[in-house]
Amino acid sequence: MKLNQFGAAIGLLATGALLSGCGSDNNAAVGSARTGPSSGQVSCGGKPTLKASGSTAQANAMTRFVNAFERSCPGQTLNYTANGSGAGVSEFNGNQTDFGGSDSPLSRKEYAAAEQRCGSQAWNLPVVFGPIAITYNVNGLSSLNLDGPTTAKIFNGSIASWNDPAIQALNTGVALPAEPIHVVFRNDESGTTDNFQRYLDVASNGEWGKGIGKTFKGGVGEGAKGNDGTSAAVKSTEGSITYNEWSFASARKLNTAKIATSADPEPIAISVDSVGKTISGATIIGEGNDLVLDTVSFYKPAQPGSYPIVLATYEIVCSKYPDAQVGRAVKAFLQSTIGGGQNGLGDNGYVPIPDSFKSRLSTAANAIA
């Protein structure tokens, strides 16, 4: 097994976009799984060593997935480079890897390139679900409440001090310091950034105003590469704030903000339960086995107790690979990921695939050739 981050070995290491290459007018709830083969079946064989790259958000999960693959299929493994969603898509489309990991589904332009690379339809298969944490480092501040509008104004520079009245109003009775806010953002193309900016765009009641995309558009702060880089920067910088995939926040023991939503003015902390409530309401907008999720409901949840900043990481695969041996191995990897690879994900800051969705996902994985 070889797991890389920015080209180096890693030890510690999960959407929504509205745009998909293949849209469907027939939305299906995540819970309305179609009948499919058992998620416990793994058909081993094919290419001995797969190569993949992309999302840093799923890097910790990939450790478990590769271990599950190796246990299920002795003699087979996967080398994964966690170099960001943008790189994962471009390397897959450039035929440098066997599949890519992305925290956003393929855009129409990316989908066209993927279809050319595959010689068949490309599919977006969400196998990792995880919250994006807003992490901060302020001396003496162990608890922080935020909401969409206030968070947006912090990350576009409209709020520049920790004792700003808007932050104080959400943290009654808390002594906030009169010190500047140091924003840290991802300086690589990032699906985490894309999802975070989509949250700000949807949940800020117009306060964001900077647009969306894989490149940070806030116009304020200092950049760092990957979830690892941003979490390390906040850990070492007094007065700083950033957005991280939860497993990195947990690994570095960073303070995380609670988030108030339109469904629940009581600020909600990240937990497996609060994120599970959020993803239970997601619908599939992709067509057939292209399982793109419509996650606008994540950002403005209807159910109280839902944590709103959640991403799904997609494995970008060919429905039919030019090399059947690659297709067979990718199928086996995904089968083991959907099965035994889900065990213990909660310990790493992820939410396991809901049982009601496993059948739908297994149907897609088993159709890969």
From Swiss-Prot:
Residue intervals passing through the bilayer: none
PROSITE patterns per record: PROKAR_LIPOPROTEIN
Oligomer status and interactors: The complex is composed of two ATP-binding proteins (PstB), two transmembrane proteins (PstC and PstA) and a solute-binding protein (PstS).
Organism: Mycobacterium leprae (strain TN)
Binding site for phosphate: 55-57, 85, 103, 190-192
Record-linked NCBIfam families: 3a0107s03 (TIGR00975)
Bilayer disposition of the protein: Lipid-anchor
Name of protein: Phosphate-binding protein PstS 3
Gene: pstS2
GO cellular component: ATP-binding cassette (ABC) transporter complex
PANTHER family xrefs: PHOSPHATE-BINDING PROTEIN PSTS
